[in-house]
A protein has these predicted regions:
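Basic phosphate/pyrophosphate-binding loop/patch that engages nucleotide-derived ligands
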Residues: 26-33, 49-64, 73, 81-85
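Rossmann-like dinucleotide-binding domain that binds NAD(P)(H)
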Residues: 91-173
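Core domains of carbohydrate- and sulfate-ester-processing enzymes
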Residues: 66-106, 290-292
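NAD(P)-dinucleotide binding in Rossmann-like oxidoreductases
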Residues: 157, 165-228
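Non-transmembrane alpha-helical segments in soluble domains
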Residues: 25, 51-54, 94, 130, ...
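Beta-strand-loop-alpha-helix segment that lines the small-molecule cofactor/substrate pocket
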Residues: 1-43, 57
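Active-site rim elements
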Residues: 37-39, 115-123, 151-156, 217-224, ...
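C-terminal helix-rich "cap/oligomerization" subdomain common to oxidoreductases
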Residues: 34, 160, 236-302
Length: 302
């Protein structure tokens, strides 16, 4: 609604489905708006530095990326209906999502763990560390070609998104990326070393002092960032009318990587993905999972 009303937008990640992300790109471009995908990672020095080192060959030929996401939530959520707090427009909060009874475990931060509104921890945290992974792999406007995953969802409470997971992606350039739960971290492994960190925003680590102290020289790849943060970058672009450092198409691509994992877990088999056409190859059921979901009442997208 905001984009169609002529507003520039900074929007928290992720989109709800793959096709919703495609519609978002079309809407931003149709109305010529500035759109910033909101994850702060591209302004965090350790992730910017990590991606630049990988892109400039400091670890040799990139072979594997290992991503670990935190274990969230820590409980299944209480579905017991509660009175809607005074002054809270719960119907507006639900928007196009299905009607459901109010409970505090459904709203605010906790919406992330309910599949009517989000894709769980893989989407919530994956949009952070998968973006760094795709940035370093030079696939930020593309994606993997194959996904294989196992996992299970929360049961017995309010939450229904993925709880346990083991995901492997394969890219056309031969790089593989794995994703498992644990202490949030990312590691790029190449033919001549590795670089990464253990812990959110934790200090950079590498297989050698030479990699850690390496300088990016003239003529090498420089990745655009803004140390003053995503909000400053967005405001600068509102004035300049240029794309911000995390524009709508790149935001959509990293959300897609997250959705691919959830779909592969639900399908229970290896999936082939065409990142150019943005469709699964030979799997109609998986493609159906990419759809824009029907809206509630007068709410609709498209």
């Amino acid at each position: 609604m905001a984009i169609r009303a002529g507003k520039d937008v900074q929007c928290e990640k992720p989109t709800l489905t793959i096709n919703e992300g495609k519609l978002l790109i079309d809407t931003v471009r149709k109305h010529n708006r500035v759109f910033q995908t909101s994850t702060e990672d591209r302004s965090v020095p350790v992730y910017h530095r990590m991606a630049e080192l990988v892109r400039n060959g400091r670890i040799g030929k990139l072979q594997r990326i290992e991503v670990i996401l935190p274990r969230q939530p820590g409980r299944p959520g209480d579905p017991t209906p509660q009175p809607v707090p005074k002054g809270f427009d719960y119907d507006m909060w639900l928007g196009p999502a299905p009607e459901a009874p109010y409970t505090k475990d459904r709203v605010l931060f906790e919406f992330r763990w309910i599949s009517d509104y989000s894709g769980g921890v893989i989407c919530d945290w994956g949009t952070h560390l998968f973006d760094t992974a795709q940035w370093g792999n030079d696939t930020e406007r593309s994606g993997p070609v194959e996904i294989e995953a196992t996992g299970s969802r929360w049961e017995g409470g309010l939450y229904d998104t993925v709880k346990e997971y083991d995901v492997t992606y394969r890219y056309a350039n031969g790089v593989t990326m794995t994703c498992r739960p644990g202490n949030p971290s990312i590691k790029f492994i190449g033919s001549e070393g590795w670089v990464g960190n253990t812990g959110w925003r934790a200090p950079l680590q590498a297989s050698s002092k030479e990699i850690l102290e390496s300088k990016i020289g003239p003529g090498e790849t420089r990745l655009f960032t803004n140390p003053k943060g995503e909000h400053r970058n967005f405001l600068d672009c509102v004035k300049s009318r240029k794309d911000p450092y995390f524009p709508v198409d790149i935001g959509h691509r990293v959300s897609t990587v997250c959705h691919l994992a959830n779909i592969a877990i639900d399908r229970g088999e290896k999936l082939k993905w065409n990142p150019e056409k943005e469709v699964f190859i030979g799997d109609d059921q998986a493609n159906e999972m990419c759809r824009i979901r029907p809206g509630r009442g007068e709410w609709k997208l498209g």
